[in-house]
């Protein structure tokens, strides 16, 4: 967002939903408008108010993505979807390397989970499978998709065959590039990185 600051003619609104909110919230920081809506039913009104030239959606697996895309299309607004971490492939590999005994929970575990919610792997797998289906439905209607990698491009070709693909070489935060460097000769071997995402295996 910092790169947009010198371009005062651009107006950017970042919107999200939070079901805990009773009413819409709004604010502005560094020239960017922020909107938090209680639910996706406020998307049409938001688009009418903001009058954007483009709707850019990050996160295609949740119902809000489909709702925003539908609201934008109803107002003849172009929609660009950013993909990263495609759910189809995340679901296919969610439990890679996890022993089968840990992937299937018995009735007792499901009963306990109702009282003390956690994340049973079979429930998580079922959830990922549903999200993958929702994402495929959203991307199946897409006309414009952006991604960073060859993986993203191949996923877009499979899931959004009618869409135009726009490569976007997004990068990591500057700290990633300016931190101390390691060299194999000095270190002895490459460091082992374990980069889980949240509570996923």
Residue ranges and their predicted role:
Residues 87, 103-144, 158:
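Membrane-proximal helix-turn-helix segments that form the acceptor-binding/catalytic region
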Residues 136-141, 146-147, 153-172, 179:
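Helix-loop-beta element that forms the nucleotide-linked donor phosphate-binding surface
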Residues 148, 168, 194-198:
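Short hydrophobic "strand-cap" motifs at the C-terminus of beta-strands
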Residues 184-201:
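Conserved donor-binding/catalytic core segment of Leloir-type glycosyltransferases
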Residues 46-63, 68, 78-80:
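Short N-terminal targeting/anchoring amphipathic segment
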């Amino acid at each position: 967002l910092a790169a947009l600051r010198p371009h005062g003619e651009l107006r950017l609104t970042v919107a999200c939903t939070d079901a805990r909110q009773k009413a819409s919230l709004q604010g502005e920081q560094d020239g960017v408008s922020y909107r938090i809506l209680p639910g996706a039913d406020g998307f049409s009104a938001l688009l009418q108010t903001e009058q954007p030239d483009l709707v850019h959606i990050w996160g295609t697996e949740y119902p809000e993505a489909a709702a925003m895309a539908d609201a934008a299309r109803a107002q003849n607004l172009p929609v660009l979807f950013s993909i990263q971490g495609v759910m189809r492939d995340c679901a296919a590999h969610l439990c890679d390397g996890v022993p089968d005994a840990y992937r299937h929970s018995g009735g007792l575990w499901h009963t306990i989970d109702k009282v003390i919610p956690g994340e049973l792997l079979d429930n998580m797998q079922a959830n990922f499978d549903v999200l993958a289906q929702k994402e495929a439905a959203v991307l199946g209607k897409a006309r414009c998709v952006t991604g960073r990698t060859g993986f993203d491009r191949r996923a877009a070709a499979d899931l959004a065959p009618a869409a135009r693909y726009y490569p976007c070489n997004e990068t990591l935060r500057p700290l990633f590039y300016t931190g101390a460097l390691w060299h194999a000769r000095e270190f002895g071997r490459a460091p082992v990185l374990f980069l889980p995402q949240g509570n996923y295996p």
